[in-house]
Amino acid sequence: MGIGQQTDQVATGIIGAMESEIAAIREAMDDVRVSTISGMHFAEGRIAGRLVVVVQCGMGMVNAGICAQTLINGFGVKRIINTGVAGSLTPELTINDFVVSTDAVQHDFDVSPIGFARGEIPYTGMVAFPADKELRAKAVAAVKSAAPASEVLEGRVCSGDQFISTPQQRDAITTAFGGVCAEMEGAAIAQVCHLNGIPYVIIRAISDDSDDMSFEEFQAEAAQECAGAVLAMVRGL
């Protein structure tokens, strides 16, 4: 039984795809207990007295969906924060700026030949899954506190099982969905949270311009910046 099922205090799930995206968050935890489920290591504990479960899900939509559902069913979390890096889809954002999700879409999901809109998840009537307004506000405030020199933009997160590395890919996504950043997990987490009635928010620091030029150079720094913002957010919950 997870910590969120053992107490009346609300437990927060925190998901990052890569070790660099969660390392600083995990290091800030007290009273840590680790469980391994589906090859993922779920660290239960506290940050500034707040109950958290922190996990590296691995890259991609399937990993993210499995992880989010496990946090809900196995650990009883009542809200989920997705942290990490992303590629910018807009000239408004540059390296180490931030995105806080208004909603999230799967940019490579397409069953339009059988009558659904591009990106629409059949039988849900939804293309985009909205983030929680209260968590969004707390996330924006946390970014401004933790990284005052960075810009923070609220907007649509576009997720898919591909690394966006060309202007052609970037333009196709923005034309279809109007998103502000691209990554590989957020929309899966958003869909799982929607189906379970769990509030969520995605916080992403920009590591590249959705090209292949800067990701490796700036990924670690951007991941660290985002982790700092998440820590500030958790301490304010």
Give the location of each predicted region:
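Regulatory input/activation interfaces that engage signals or partners
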Residues: I198-Y200, A205-L237
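N-terminal short beta-loop-beta anion/metal-coordinating cradle
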Residues: G2-Q69
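Mid-sequence, gly/pro-rich, charge-dense loop/helix-turn segments that line enzyme active sites
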Residues: L89-F177
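Generic non-transmembrane alpha-helical segments
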Residues: A28, E134-A149, V192, G228-G236
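Proline-aspartate-enriched helix->loop->beta-strand connector
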Residues: V77-I81
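Alpha-helix C-terminal capping segments
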Residues: T70-G74, E92-L93, A190-P199
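A C-terminal functional module that forms or caps the active site or interfaces directly
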Residues: D161-I202, S207-D212
